[in-house]
Amino acid sequence: MRLDALVINLNRFGDLLLSQPLLHDLHKAGRSTTLLCLEKYADTEGLLQFASPLLTVPDHLVSPEQADATRHELQAWAENLRASVQADHIINLTPSMPARLLATALAPTPEAVLGFGLDHKGRPRVDGLWPAFLHAAELRQSNAPFNLADMFRMTGAPLLGGLSGELLSQPGSGLLSELGTEARETARRLLAHAPVIRHGFIGMQLGARE
């Protein structure tokens, strides 16, 4: 499979859903793309547009706590994936060292990594101002000067050319996929068991941070 851009997001589930606007913008700009996430979030493919086939990496290979022990195994896994998936650019939205190693291993050159990568000497590399904002937000949510979804989008903006501003302003851009009939019926069955006094509206926040 040949891609213009592979988006790597090894963050939490809520952050993963916030990749949708970036995927939408890349698609509208004519870029072939998909998403690489943690294996435990494989079912997310049904919620995201322009992320099929969704690629997943075993969770333990990219755990920061096991980075030293799994480094060589992760490198071998990346080389195996690259044999079947070639991307001209990697957009890495995760600043951890395993994510940087993975992004660099999948990219044709270190300079082809947007966001968080490694330089030719293996030192951490941040490509631009927006990833720097994103890194600050990852360290402490209260440091985030902008909406997380927009920081994701602007990290990938170099691949959008002059379209980035236009795409960001489009109404309805970056919406998640609509739920299928089976998922809707499951939700209705769950809500049907609610006590009478609970009937009405239900609010959900997927991926709450603090």
Predicted regions and their residues:
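Catalytic machinery of carbohydrate-active enzymes
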Residues: 1-210
